[in-house]
């Protein structure tokens, strides 16, 4: 025992030496110095109560020494150079000076404006000395207060279809009095405008000028009300049944000008086409083209009615130079002396009256038997002949259809044209002569929940005030009037104060809102004008991925404020965004442009910019001046660059910035006041850099920061006061809990504290701290005694003693592990957190983890081997199937190799394991939490599944042995129930110790695999107290409590007692000599002797099957 104690002391001294050589992360944690007395001269008072004072030299040094940050506050240190000081606690950006808004609570920022110089390049001083942004000039708003910024402006004249606001702004007439303000001054919605008798109210909700009523042009698109009951028609007019007068030239032109289409029902069959010899096809841009008489071309009357002039009056000027230039200069000369633009030549549309522009072209293709050839040469499927749809440009496919034979599922019009049978009498005019809607059955009676159209048609109420496809709703569109109070459903778009359309019809290239182009406003279009490089929509210009080397605009499109220039090759210079039209930009995306630097003054005029994206470039540094001018910037994303240095005062002017993303850079050092000026910052992300040191004062004056992300760095040197003066800090993300020890109390910090350690101690629980020493000493001493005791039997060839010796070696190593952890805890007491990372990555911790795994699994597999040996012995007592010593050595050698490999594999450098044993301060790799740390599957396989199988094997084997032994005794000696009870107790003790050790770990492991999390203290108790339990109890169960050991101890105690008595009496003649042949009375009567005699009698009188000694004597 003395030798053992000496060995233990030597080991502890060695461990202490190794621990002393480890270098911890320098957290600059100093011993707390006595507080500076506030009464001493030369100190600064942090608060009015004089509870904390610091040296005067610490004031305004960039490091918050006061817990409340008072030594670095505005009250103490004043404002930055780019700021204006309102009072002793408040600063504002200088750009807010003299802007007619009291940004200071005392109004100080709006005083003495007559001598204040406005920011050059971005603002202009007007007559009353206030500063107005350049883009606010001539914006129809009085920004100065005296309207001086709106007086010297060039305004355009409003056209006839526009309303002139009181401030001279022009808006479309369709927007007048629709409930939405379009004039900046709101004059389009005021009472004066809307109650005026200058306007005519259409049933669909829009207003038109009264001079547009009865002007021959329909402005009330749904009802034609502005053109009804106007006058008696002239001789050159045609009168519709609804009283509208139209030009006779528009009768039978293929377009319904009358609401009831009267003008197209009086036509002869031969007028359903547009033959070139007598007719002229209008080149209509909107809707169905008209076919007019040739005599109406160039007659100075708009007969095509497809614009203010009409395409029939285009190219009518007799240009004397037309013959000379002809096609060479871009013209084609018609015989009727009309000059056509070159692109109209051979375009399959005759523009010359007799079609000369289409005669000298390529020969028309030859059509197949299944095709019909139009007169101008185009081939169309024969099935489209006479189907009431104009497929040929000259409508020749719908001519001469009187004798046309319709298909089986079609119905023939009086004109011979064919329409589908289900379209007959459907309230829609399908036949060119309207015969499909004549002689129809009486109109049906509408049901109570249906809506009746003016034409008698019944429709579903859900179709009311919804403009759908051609056959949705009323054919006469009466369901679309009086819809000003209708509420659109989800997925619908409201046409201002009128009906609704499906959202899919918005920005589809077709105007569906009849009163205005509301559904086609703010749609995506190609820009800049005439270049088609980018796509614009609303205020956004998207030039992403166009390989641009310079900005594509020389003059910014009106109202564009969001520029997306990402994924290009832009060459950024100090003048790239210097033009005045960039000062209204609020969002700028320059990501993925291969930028290597940001020249100073690059954004000096972009004071309205709120979002700047510089991510994923090759920027290596940020210079002082690179971000100058971005005083209103709120979010800066510069992640994914190669930034190594950030110059001082780089962010000093960005006082409104709230989000700064500097992740994925190459920063190595965060110096004092690096983020000076970021007073409104709430999120600071400097994760995934190469930061190894952070100075005190690095986050100075970030009074509003709520989240700081430091994860993904290799920080080795960090100031103790680095997180002081951050009163609103809510969350801190790091890679190690040691940094959380510096954060203010109440901050949510990750990663979480491990289950064992605190900022001060490796073992934070005092009970566990004592337990680990107790269990370690018991396991070490107890198993050493067992090894010493069993070696004599091993030399005698006893297999069982050999196995017990292996078990004791495994448990002895567990004691070594416990004492390593206990010694480390003692050594690091009070300063553990500064050595946390280095300890967990140290070779000693890795060795401790190896020893714990090796010990645990060696014990488990050895117990399983012992159990199987006993089971075979009980089940087959007559066979010589027990392990011999040689076989036992082979088995245990295999087990030693296996557990060695299991324990050493995580130390071989595989990336899968990643500090497998250093996941906690006690160097254990147990997986009993939901965290999926590297190597967790391996941990589950070794500590959960393997141990579960071993426990099931041991428990079931002992139950089987007890059952067999009990039946044997019942058959032979029913009187020996006492021995049965003793055997049952020993078996129960063996199984229950295994149960208490392994089952909690196994259960907790499976619970964690299901995603549940137990209390951290549960894990700590199981890992430190429960896991080593078997190592402390196995020596007692398998050796120290057995009859041979107890008998030997008693015998030696008697020897010692007799020797001690004889030494006092002086009688040495009868001293005890153990020669193996003589036996003293004490020995003969000793309990050990009685047990031996009892065992021999049992063997002589019992059947050979009963072999109980190995179960409860364990000799």
UniProtKB/Swiss-Prot annotation:
* Membrane-traversing stretches: 768-788, 802-822, 858-878, 888-908, 942-962, 989-1009, 1018-1038
Task: Spell out the CDD domains in the cross-references.
Answer: 7tmA_Relaxin_R (cd15137), LDLa (cd00112)
Extracellular face of the membrane: 25-767, 823-857, 909-941, 1010-1017
Expression tissues: Predominantly expressed in a small number of neurons within the central nervous system and to a lesser extent in the heart.
Q: Name one GO molecular function term.
A: G protein-coupled peptide receptor activity
Q: Which residues form the LDL-receptor class A domain?
A: 36-79, 77-115, 116-155, 156-196, 195-232, 231-269, 272-318, 320-363, 365-403, 404-442, 444-485, 486-525
Family affiliation: Belongs to the G-protein coupled receptor 1 family.
**Protein name from the UniProt record:** G-protein coupled receptor GRL101
């Amino acid at each position: 025992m003395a030798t053992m104690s000496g060995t233990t002391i030597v080991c502890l001294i060695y461990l202490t030496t190794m621990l002393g050589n480890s270098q911890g992360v320098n957290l600059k944690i100093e011993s707390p110095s006595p507080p500076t007395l506030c009464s001493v001269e030369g100190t600064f008072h942090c608060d009015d109560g004089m509870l904390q004072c610091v040296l005067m030299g610490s004031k305004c040094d960039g490091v918050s020494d006061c817990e409340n940050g008072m030594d670095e506050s505005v009250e103490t240190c004043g404002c930055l150079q780019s700021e204006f000081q309102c009072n002793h606690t408040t600063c504002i950006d200088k750009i807010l000076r003299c802007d007619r808004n009291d940004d200071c609570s005392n109004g100080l920022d709006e005083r003495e404006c007559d001598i204040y110089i406005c920011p050059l390049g971005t603002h202009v001083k007007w007559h009353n000395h206030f500063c107005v942004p350049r883009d606010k000039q001539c914006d129809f708003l009085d920004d100065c207060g005296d309207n001086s910024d709106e007086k010297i402006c060039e305004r355009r004249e409003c056209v006839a279809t526009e309303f002139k606001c009181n401030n001279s702004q022009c808006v479309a007439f369709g927007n007048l009095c629709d409930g939405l303000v379009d004039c900046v001054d709101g004059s389009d919605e005021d009472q004066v405008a809307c109650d005026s008798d200058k306007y005519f109210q259409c049933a669909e909700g829009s207003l038109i000028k009264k001079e547009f009523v009865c002007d021959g042009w329909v402005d009330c698109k749904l009802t034609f009300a502005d053109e009804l009951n106007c006058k008696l028609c002239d001789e050159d007019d045609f009168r519709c049944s609804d009283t509208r007068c139209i030009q006779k030239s528009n009768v039978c032109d293929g377009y319904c000008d009358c609401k009831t289409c009267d003008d197209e029902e009086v036509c002869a069959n031969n007028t359903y086409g547009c033959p070139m010899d007598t007719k002229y096809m209008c080149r209509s841009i909107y809707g169905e083209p008209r076919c007019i008489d040739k005599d109406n071309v160039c007659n100075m009357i708009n007969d095509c009615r497809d614009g203010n002039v009409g395409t029939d009056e285009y190219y009518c000027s007799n240009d004397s130079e037309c013959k000379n230039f002809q096609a060479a200069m871009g013209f084609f000369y018609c015989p009727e002396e009309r000059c056509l633009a070159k692109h109209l030549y051979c375009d399959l549309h005759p523009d010359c009256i007799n079609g000369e522009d289409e005669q000298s072209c390529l020969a028309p293709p030859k059509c197949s038997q299944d095709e019909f050839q139009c007169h101008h040469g185009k081939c169309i499927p024969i099935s489209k002949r006479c189907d009431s749809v104009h497929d040929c440009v000259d409508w020749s496919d719908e001519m001469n259809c009187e004798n046309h034979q319709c298909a089986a599922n079609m119905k023939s019009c009086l004109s011979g044209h064919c329409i589908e049978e289900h379209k007959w009498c459907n309230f829609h005019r399908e036949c060119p002569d309207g015969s499909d809607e004549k002689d129809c059955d009486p109109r049906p009676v509408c049901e109570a929940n249906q809506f009746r159209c003016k034409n008698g048609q019944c429709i579903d109420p859900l179709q009311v005030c919804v403009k759908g496809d051609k056959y949705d709703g009323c054919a006469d569109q009466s369901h679309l009037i009086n819809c000003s109070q209708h509420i659109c459903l989800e997925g619908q778009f409201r046409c201002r104060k009128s009906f609704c359309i499906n959202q899919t019809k918005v920005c589809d290239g077709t105007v569906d809102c009849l009163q205005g182009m509301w559904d086609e406003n703010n749609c995506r279009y190609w820009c800049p004008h005439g270049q088609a490089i980018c796509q614009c929509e609303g205020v956004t210009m998207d030039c992403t991925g166009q390989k641009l080397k310079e900005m594509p605009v020389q003059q910014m499109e009106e109202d564009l404020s969001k520029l997306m220039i990402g994924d290009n090759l832009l060459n950024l210079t100090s003048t790239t965004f210097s033009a005045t039209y960039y000062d209204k930009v609020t969002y700028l995306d320059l990501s993925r442009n291969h930028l290597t630097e940001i020249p100073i003054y690059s954004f000096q005029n972009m004071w309205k910019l709120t979002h700047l994206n510089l991510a994923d470039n090759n920027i290596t540094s940020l210079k002082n001046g690179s971000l100058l001018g971005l005083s209103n910037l709120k979010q800066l994303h510069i992640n994914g660059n190669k930034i190594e240095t950030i110059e001082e005062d780089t962010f000093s002017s960005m006082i409104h910035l709230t989000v700064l993303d500097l992740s994925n850079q190459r920063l190595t050092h965060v110096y004092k006041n690096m983020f000076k000026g970021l007073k409104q910052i709430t999120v600071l992300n400097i994760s995934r850099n190469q930061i190894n040191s952070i100075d005190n004062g690095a986050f100075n004056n970030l009074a509003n920061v709520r989240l700081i992300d430091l994860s993904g760095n290799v920080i080795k040197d960090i100031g103790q006061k680095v997180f002081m003066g951050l009163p609103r800090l809510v969350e801190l993300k790091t890679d190690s809990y040691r940094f959380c020890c510096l954060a203010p109390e109440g901050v949510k910090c990750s990663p979480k504290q491990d289950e064992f350690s605190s900022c001060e101690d490796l073992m934070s629980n005092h009970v566990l701290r004592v337990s680990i020493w107790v269990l370690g000493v018991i396991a070490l001493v107890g198993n050493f005694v067992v090894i010493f005791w069993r070696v004599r039997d091993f030399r005698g060839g006893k297999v069982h003693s050999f196995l017990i010796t292996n078990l004791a070696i495994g448990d002895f190593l567990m004691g070594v592990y416990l004492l390593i952890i206990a010694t480390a805890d003692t050594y690091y007491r009070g300063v553990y957190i500064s050595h946390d990372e280095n300890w967990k990555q140290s070779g000693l911790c890795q060795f401790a983890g190896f020893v714990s795994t090796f010990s645990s699994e060696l014990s488990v597999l050895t117990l399983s081997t012992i159990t199987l040996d006993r089971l075979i012995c009980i089940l087959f007592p007559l066979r010589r199937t027990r392990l011999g010593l040689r076989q036992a050595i082979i088995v245990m050698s295999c087990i030693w190799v296996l557990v060695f490999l299991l324990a050493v594999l995580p130390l071989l450098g595989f990336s899968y394991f990643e500090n497998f044993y250093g996941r906690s301060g006690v160097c254990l790799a147990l997986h009993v939490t939901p965290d999926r740390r590297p190597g967790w599957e391996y941990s589950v396989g070794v500590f959960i599944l393997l141990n579960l199988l071993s426990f099931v094997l041991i428990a079931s084997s002992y139950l089987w042995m007890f059952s067999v032994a009990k039946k044997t005794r019942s058959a032979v000696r029913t009187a020996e129930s006492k021995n049965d009870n003793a055997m049952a107790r020993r078996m129960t003790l063996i199984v229950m110790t295994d149960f208490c050790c392994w089952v909690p770990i196994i259960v907790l492991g499976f619970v964690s695999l299901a995603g549940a999390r137990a209390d951290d203290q549960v894990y700590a108790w199981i890992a430190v107290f429960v896991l080593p339990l078997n190592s402390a109890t196995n020596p007692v169960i398998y050796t120290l409590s057995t009859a041979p050991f107890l008998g030997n101890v008693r015998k030696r105690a008697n020897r010692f007692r007799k020797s001690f008595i004889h030494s006092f009496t002086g009688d040495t003649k009868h001293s005890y000599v153990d020669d193996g042949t003589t036996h003293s009375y004490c020995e003969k009567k000793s309990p050990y002797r009685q047990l031996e005699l009892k065992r021999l009698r049992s063997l002589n009188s019992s059947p050979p099957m009963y072999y109980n000694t190995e179960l409860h004597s364990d000799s």
